[in-house]
Amino acid sequence: ARFEITNRCTYTVWAASVPVGGGVQLNPGQSWSVDVPAGTKGARVWARTGCNFDGSGRGGCQTGDCGGVLDCKAYGAPPNTLAEYGLNGFNNLDFFDISLVDGFNVPMDFSPTSNGCTRGISCTADINGQCPSELKTQGGCNNPCTVFKTDQYCCNSGSCGPTDYSRFFKQRCPDAYSYPKDDPPSTFTCNGGTDYRVVFCP
């Protein structure tokens, strides 16, 4: 599957794609194409902001940092708006979602572009600007689990319900996962072999 990752923000982001892709700097208007093998699971695409890297690709980012390297091998540090997917899973379906379980840093659209699959997801609200003060952080809005680390928000025991904080995210981005046990409608499917695009600041 081909993933086209485009930065429509007015500022530079450092896109990340794991486990396939790594990371690149995307200036406003730039795109990056990643070819992802069939069967790839547990995959994420996200934007990093406020980064500084040296010539060898070492440094760090204000949001979404993946261990201080440009070429990500690991997931990013919250807060980061996540495009998550698994390809060719049950019944050869692709499963994809936008998740705010690790908080929000950059608005995002995640949509299929082929195979007759048309239902995409977007999360474009001004979550950073409206973020509750206790969740605010440099460059983003944290999920309460990151801040409070309690079972109520993190669902470590496997069962938990929505909270005022998760509703804050859900009201602004109804198609995105707002907490770990959020409703299944937050996950979307296409037939295997579909191509996708991720747009930052759509």
UniProtKB/Swiss-Prot annotation:
One of its GO terms (biological process) is defense response. PANTHER family: OS03G0233200 PROTEIN. Signal peptide: none annotated. Disulfide bonds join 9-201, 51-61, 66-72, 117-190, 123-173, 131-141, 145-154, 155-160. The lineage of its organism: Eukaryota, Viridiplantae, Streptophyta, Embryophyta, Tracheophyta. Keywords: Disulfide bond. The keyword Nucleotide-binding does not apply. This is Protein P21. Belongs to the thaumatin family. It comes from the Eukaryota. PROSITE patterns: THAUMATIN_1, THAUMATIN_2. It comes from Glycine max (Soybean). SMART domains: THN. The keyword Kinase does not apply.
